[in-house]
């Protein structure tokens, strides 16, 4: 409803601590939110659903509304004439989906833009067009390549849990090395329990729980986020020294495995790899 002094050209305001944003809307104020935990919409989507809204949800919006009224006291008395509630697409890692699908050649995707579609449209459109015309990525676009997800990410339970976290990351601190908190323990190594018993602090890569570092000297195996040197630094240094000066064992369960067969397999690998691959059967080569 109208608020004294409000007008269309009011600057957009954002309060990441309160997870809200607001701007002028005529002679009123529009209030929105990127809540830390959003509400997944996983009901069957009608085939003809496009640019439509769903029902009001004042209960879910109660916290952002209270935060908005604290930030803009005039909202206490003005009220709201309209509640706009519609679904938005978010991906499991907060990066959009682009490129040719692995299941069907010549089918290209540009979707899941995580509320930054307008801001990303120019660059995404250009590089996708060049990708289609040229037949390959014009630059390194692996972080948004649709092929980066495996079957584990096409699971409703996984998506429901992870999507609730992703939206809120827009207004959370972008810590270096931040790990997702939801939809964890999807894919575990046979050694997972033994690694955990040795103090492993796990991160997730392609759904696999993999040790990032091992806690030492009674410390907790939990990441303490910082823009400076983080709490794992000395632990990592000890592991590095052990690998250089003594011996280390690596669990490579979570790494991809490719099998190359055929008469020219060795020649191709010798060309691709930096190390000598021509070794007897049963040996391994680090390259």
Q: Which residue stretches match the model-derived regions?
A:
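Short, glycine-/Ser/Thr-/acidic-enriched flexible segments
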Residues: 3, 27, 36-37, 103, ...
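Pocket-edge structural micro-motifs
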Residues: 24, 31-35, 82, 99-100, ...
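Conserved FAD-binding catalytic core of PHBH/FMO-like flavoproteins
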Residues: 2-37
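C-terminal catalytic lobe of FAD-dependent flavoproteins
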Residues: 17, 26, 47-188
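Glycine/proline-enriched, intrinsically flexible loops and inter-domain linkers
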Residues: 139-140, 144-287
